[in-house]
Amino acid sequence: MMATYEGRYTDAQALRIAVVVARFNDLVTGKLLSGCLDCLARHGVDTSSNSDQLDVAWVPGAFELPIVTQTLALSGQYEVVITLGAVIRGDTPHFDVVVAEASKGIASVSRETGVPVIFGVLTTDTMQQALERAGIKSNLGWSYGLQALEMGSLMGVLRSATSAS
């Protein structure tokens, strides 16, 4: 018989979540973080300053996201890690280098640790595009929060299913 595995948004109280936020372009990343925290709070995650369920780490920029994400994932304290950043194209190839290394690094953390890592790094051509995605039109931070809840729950379901068989 075929098994179907899905994560739910209602298992939030059982999750420990880390959010790693790039400070560079903090006008954008701060809005992403606000949207993310709003989503998590509305789904039952304690987002208060004395929360035992959520930690937020700030890094200088998107390039530094992978190393801190890896450290948190390897700690064994979190079911899911969310990364938030904003890389905006400029006049030099720097954009391409930062985006490539951040995305490869973040993806490898998830594969190597088995901890879901949500890729919440905006890559846009202009500040206007980034702001539109961080709250002017919609806030993708909310979506990243939902993805974290779903993946954290799904991994719990999968671990239970595979340990029972």
From Swiss-Prot:
BP-aspect Gene Ontology terms: riboflavin biosynthetic process
Coiled coil segments of this chain: none
Pfam families reported in the protein's UniProt record: DMRL_synthase (PF00885)
Keywords: Riboflavin biosynthesis, Transferase
Alphabetical list of InterPro entries matching this protein: LS (IPR034964), LS/RS (IPR002180), LS/RS_sf (IPR036467)
Broadest EC class assigned to this enzyme: transferase
EC number(s) from the headed UniProt entry: 2.5.1.78
Residues the entry annotates as binding 5-amino-6-(D-ribitylamino)uracil: F24, A62, F63, E64, A86, V87, I88, F119
GO cellular component: cytosol; riboflavin synthase complex
Protein name as catalogued: 6,7-dimethyl-8-ribityllumazine synthase
Gene name of the encoded protein: ribH
